[in-house]
UniProtKB/Swiss-Prot annotation:
GO terms for biological process: ATP synthesis coupled electron transport. It comes from Phascolarctos cinereus. PANTHER family: NADH-UBIQUINONE OXIDOREDUCTASE CHAIN 4L, NADH-UBIQUINONE OXIDOREDUCTASE SUBUNIT ND4L. It catalyses: a ubiquinone + NADH + 5 H(+)(in) = a ubiquinol + NAD(+) + 4 H(+)(out). This is NADH-ubiquinone oxidoreductase chain 4L. Keywords: Electron transport, Membrane, Mitochondrion, Mitochondrion inner membrane, NAD, Respiratory chain, Translocase, Transmembrane, Transmembrane helix, Transport, Ubiquinone.
Amino acid sequence: MTSINLNLMTAFLLALAGVLMYRSHLMSTLLCLEGMMLSLYIMLSLLISHFHMFSLSMAPLILLVISACEAAGGLALLVKMSNNYGNDYVQNLNLLQC
């Protein structure tokens, strides 16, 4: 395992630990999720270029588009929560409420 792969896996695991530890605020959770997606994007790009699987060259771009949509949805939820409640506590989310 090269040092680049080790650093990327460490970045992913640190972002995952951040999601699990700092889940009280939505903004910190969204930042950790974005870090996870970016490390996955870089790992997927390196994997495709290392094994010369150029038939999968669109996969990192699709992952990047999905992560951008996820970030936009998360920011929209953050703005809606801050307008309604005045804070970004995840405990204010009630998924059963319309």
